[in-house]
């Protein structure tokens, strides 16, 4: 399906000046869609206040927050991962859950004791393949919701800290998108 902006001044710009290129992030979402699996993606975004400070010699790597297991983020996600209803869904429908933490949260994956029906995404797995192969996503505020919506797949929100998330302690702020 080709989508484009119609209000470009055609007397100034023509087909030679404008290329219809698409958006690579979304273009790849329709490749290999026949590999659909009975899986649900779990992807929760990071929290600036709990990821630890940047290392002094490296502004792309953070110190580990050794109090991570005391955060509401860890406690609520860990409880969610071990929820009996989630386990029942996995067993009843033979569903696999794929957990893909935000890159800033990957160092904390080791703190979670994931049940056997939740698999962490492998380091060599391409994100668009996981999206294509998943029936739906459960997320909090991650933009991954747009990838699933683009494919007309269900998005389920689990937002346990919405007020705290948007109170100015994180890099996100409320925008045009209404989660409610």
Model-derived segments and spans:
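Catalytic binding pocket for nucleotide-activated donors in carbohydrate/polymer assembly enzymes
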Residues: 15, 111-117, 143-180
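Donor nucleotide-activated moiety binding/catalytic core segment of transferases
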Residues: 98, 103-146, 151
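A short acidic (Asp/Glu
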Residues: 3-7, 29-33, 52-53, 109-112, ...
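Short, well-ordered beta-strand core segments
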Residues: 1, 137-138, 155
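Short, acidic/turn-prone active-site loops that include or flank metal/cofactor-
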Residues: 23-25, 122-126, 160-164
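Conserved catalytic-core segment of nucleotide-activated headgroup transferases in glycan assembly
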Residues: 19, 24-111
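Active-site-proximal region of nucleotide-activated glycan assembly enzymes
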Residues: 1-27
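Short, charged, surface-exposed secondary-structure boundary motifs
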Residues: 29-31, 127-133, 166-173
């Amino acid at each position: 399906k080709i989508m484009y902006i119609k209000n470009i001044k055609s007397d100034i710009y023509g087909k030679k000046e404008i290329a219809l290129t698409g958006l690579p992030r979304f273009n790849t979402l329709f490749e290999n869609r026949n590999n659909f699996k009975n899986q649900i993606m779990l992807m929760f975004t990071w929290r600036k206040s709990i990821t630890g400070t940047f290392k002094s010699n490296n502004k792309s790597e953070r110190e580990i927050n050794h109090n991570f297991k005391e955060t509401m983020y860890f406690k609520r996600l860990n409880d969610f991962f071990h929820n009996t209803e989630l386990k029942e869904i996995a067993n009843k429908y033979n569903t696999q859950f794929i957990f893909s933490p935000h890159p800033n949260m990957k160092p904390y994956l080791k703190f979670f004791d994931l049940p056997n029906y939740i698999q962490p995404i492998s380091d060599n797995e391409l994100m668009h393949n996981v999206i294509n192969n998943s029936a739906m996503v459960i997320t909090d505020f991650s933009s991954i919701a747009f990838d699933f919506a683009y494919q007309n797949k269900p998005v389920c929100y689990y937002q346990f800290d919405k007020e705290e998330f948007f109170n100015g302690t994180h890099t996100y702020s409320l925008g045009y998108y209404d989660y409610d």
